Amino acid sequence: MNFEIHNEEIDHKLEAYDYILDETLIANKPSKVRHESRLMIVRDSSLEEDFTTNKYTKNLLDELRKGDLVVVNDTKVMKARLKVELENGKLVELLVLEKADQSTWLCLARPAKKLKINSQLNLKSSLAKDIKLHISGTDKETGGRFIKFPENINDLISMNNLLDIYGETPLPPYIKSAEEESFHENSYQTEYASNPGAVAAPTAGLHLSKSLISNLKKKGILVMPITLHVGYGTFKPIDQEDLSNLKLHKEWVRVSSEVVEEIKRVKKTDRRVIAIGTTSVRALESCYSYEMGDLIPIDKYVDLVIKPGYKFKVVDGLLTNFHLPKSSLLLLVSAMIGRERLLNLYKKAIREKFRFFSYGDAMYISPDSFLVKK
């Protein structure tokens, strides 16, 4: 089968990105050692052995060359899940997404129908005094609520400080875990997380242990950070069947001039840019200015959509997890190696009992596996 031929009509249909997964393969906790998670390595589709399944994330070291640039997302997951009390005493859950204006923040709510506009909420903690919140409006795009916090909660730093006291780790709903909150505070965070702002983890980075990062550097592989605060744009379910005009919610990205200059140096040689996670891909590809025909540093919100037919300007390889059906992340990886091939690889991963989603195993998309060779 020739996986380099896109069927654009099929590729633009959401249903084409569906697959069946046994719930027992959804990982509810990570590997005991980060770099001991299983790794599927995807190679050139023309090879007889075009993928390998008997590897571990620590074997990524063998796939990379001296001089390669590995880019990680250093965002830090905030304890963005809040349990708040309604005026009638019943509890609802908020997920703080982003600042809307001054001290008003956009939050997803569960169940949302119980949050009436202009009503009050009570935020409690055994560690601090109660805080009164006010519901000021509804967001049409997300279905979330605009919540007015105290006036001093007006930036990421102040919000993160509040969440450290009142919040909980925002685990995805498909993770059914009996572990204590303290376990997830560590395990649902990368080793290099340093910039609070995410409401979900850049999960490919969960596979990188300190020792693996150290070994990469010892081999002469550069490891540099970018920041993309993982938010609604990454995990929002796609609600349209026709993907031709798909739009994603914006996410804040920072790529420094140092990273951009190193990428330019890499591109002048036979070295490669390897992204750790789809969020790193989205950040790096957002650096390309079509007006200037060049890479530029960025510090802004981006809403780049990567789906089949997209031509990669920056990224040569990718370490990623196994993603949910019909997700924007599945579209992104399909843009690299083709939708049909990716879904066939997922079938093989399912047969071999790979673990899926945030706490699951990993896939390495090697540079020679890209549909369009660099």
UniProtKB/Swiss-Prot annotation:
GO terms for biological process, alphabetical: queuosine biosynthetic process; tRNA wobble guanine modification
Organism, scientific name: Prochlorococcus marinus subsp. pastoris (strain CCMP1986 / NIES-2087 / MED4)
Matches recorded under NCBIfam families: PRK00147.1 (NF001140), queA (TIGR00113)
Cellular compartments per GO CC: cytoplasm
Domain of life: Bacteria
Protein's name in the database: S-adenosylmethionine:tRNA ribosyltransferase-isomerase
Keyword Secreted: no
Metabolic or biological pathway, per its Swiss-Prot or TrEMBL entry: tRNA modification; tRNA-queuosine biosynthesis
